[in-house]
Curated annotation (Swiss-Prot):
Family, similarity comment: Belongs to the LipB family.
Name recorded for this polypeptide: Octanoyltransferase
Enzyme class: transferase
Chief site of localization: cytoplasm
Gene Ontology MF terms: lipoyl(octanoyl) transferase activity
Record organism: Shewanella woodyi (strain ATCC 51908 / MS32)
């Protein structure tokens, strides 16, 4: 398998737990020749609590389920109208560390938004992407066997009110913002298409192979 090939899977809207378990399965079963993949998905409303998550940051979940997961970071929200992207990357094979992967992901979002004349930036002390101190994208990864899973969530055109039920990423009073308000991509499909371009460029992938949905083998 060429190290310069990235397989991009478009999953549509999928239940969070089924995609999470599929990511785990792919990571656990992959070997040195397994292709790197980027999964593009939307989830129904769900709060996910990272390994470092504290329960006091979940203020009033109401009817939205809370799932404890095995990624870094604190609590965040996923829902329709949000682009979620999961990079399943063999960072050992790419000879980069997790910090570099985080930087590459953040830069991919920043560069994508720059194409819409939106000035975004990352913060060294608080992973994610921001515009005028408001957070537009959240980030949480897990590395296992030298390979990444979990990923990023970019707010595109969604109901933002569930963020008020939590302290997003563990920060009380953190204001969230979405691309629609900023003049960025207006649909999840558009955002996904643009993110694939900047992400694949930043990670050095020269060939893209596109798939719809998940196959049993993920190949």
């Amino acid at each position: 398998m060429s190290e310069s090939t990235l397989h991009v899977r478009y999953l549509g809207q999928q239940d969070y737990e089924s995609v999470w378990h599929a990511m785990q399965e792919y990571t656990d079963n992959r070997d040195s020749s397994s292709p790197d993949q980027l999964w593009i998905v939307e989830h129904p409303p769900v709060f996910t609590q990272g390994q470092a998550g504290k329960s006091e940051h979940i203020l009033n979940p109401g009817d939205i389920p809370v799932i404890q997961v095995d990624r870094g970071g604190q609590v965040t929200y996923h829902g329709p109208g949000q682009l979620v992207a999961y990079p399943l990357i063999n960072i050992k094979r790419l000879k980069i560390g997790v910090r570099q992967l985080v930087t590459d992901i953040e830069n991919s979002i920043v560069q994508m938004l720059e194409n819409y004349q939106v000035k975004a930036y990352a913060k060294a002390d608080a992973p994610g992407v921001y515009v005028d101190e408001r957070k537009v994208a959240s980030l949480g990864l897990r590395i296992r066997k030298g390979c990444s899973f979990h990923g990023l969530a970019l707010n595109v055109d969604m109901d933002m009110s569930p963020f008020q039920r939590i302290n997003p990423c563990g920060y009380a009073g953190l204001e969230m913002v979405q691309c629609k308000q900023l003049g960025g991509p207006q649909t999840v499909e558009e955002a996904g298409e643009q993110l694939v371009k900047t992400f694949s460029h930043n990670l050095g992938y020269q060939n893209l192979v596109h798939h719809q949905g998940l196959s049993q083998s993920y190949e």
